[in-house]
Amino acid sequence: MSELNMTPREIVAYLDEYIIGQKEAKKSIAIAFRNRYRRLQLEKSLQEEITPKNILMIGSTGVGKTEIARRIAKIMKLPFVKVEASKYTEVGFVGRDVESMVRDLVNNSVLLVENEHKEKLKDKIEEAVIEKIAKKLLPPLPNGVSEEKKQEYANSLLKMQQRIAQGELDSREIEIEVRKKSIEIDSNVPPEILRVQENLIKVFHKEQDKVKKTLSVKEAKEALKAEISDTLLDGESIKMEGLKRAESSGVIFIDEIDKIAVSSKERGRQDPSKEGVQRDLLPIVEGSVVNTKYGSIKTEHILFIAAGAFHLAKPSDLIPELQGRFPLRVELESLTEEIMYMILTQTKTSIIKQYQALLKVEGVEIAFEDDAIKELAKLSYNANQKSEDIGARRLHTTIEKVLEDISFEAEDYSGQNVTITKELVQSKLEDLVADENLVKYIL
């Protein structure tokens, strides 16, 4: 169920394991992602005519907007990038221009393809690494030795490789040659400046220069993996595949789009990160060509999902042209006390399970009574009502507060079973939640 051809029903069933409620949002997104698969099954001429139906998600923070898109992109192995609209400025002003989100998507896509190729060659890479380390640990075979000696050496090399693979020699130190670390390049600068940076690096920094390092066998394995991967992988085909995948099935999630909406009260004020950014977004969303360090990419088949709380502005405050580029609108529901409880008990990797796993490392077995979980949900919901509504994120803060002392003194509880009761939850949280002046301290 981890392939691109998941049906909408399968996508929603998968999302239900991690996100409670929001049926309409899940349904709309599932259809949008399935349509990408359907489009790829058509003949080329028709593929070009079908563009994705971009989605605008409306809902307060912490209700699952980002998580829905991120989870689908992950299970379907699609290039995905999440950006915040408020971080961009209009072209001509100091700051990031909107085209950099497309370059970020291409970078993620190339990395995704590279990791897939590495996974396919995993065994081959490990064999090459182990063989190289084994030859370093064994003294070299002199020239002109007999066939018998050669066979003995081959047997010794094989035994050495087996010991290295099993981790028996991980602590032994060896001297190996590794490539110098390459200089990091800022990919968010325009392509022209990027090319200048790359040329300067070629002049002042030879990537093939190697340095000798003394490392443990365990460290040497990791150091050599990256080097041997580069020699076995076809870099050019990976770049081309990454570029193509970003172009045909990439997803850009634009969060906080409401922050660049200009309400009627603000109209007339100069703000380079608002209406100007919307106008810069237009050509990218409707389809244009963006230059990246891997080549040019057309954006017309990239799926754009915009999201915002729209507390201070309305979707209609976005410029009409941009509104038209997001034809599908989904409103996400605020979280109720019941949904808060279900998030804690029914999700596959619930916060409770996460904390239980973390404390189990210290030998502490944590159990939550059902009444305690209900109280956590109730107090978290009340805190959201009295202060800023931050949705499910409130649960992280309240559980952290309840388990704070146990986490701090974990070694004292090692080997014990600790039960979290309703009374414990109340003693840790109720005095804070009850006081509206103090509730702001529960972030």
Language-model segments: which ranges?
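Non-catalytic accessory segments flanking P-loop/AAA+ NTPase cores
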Residues: 1-443
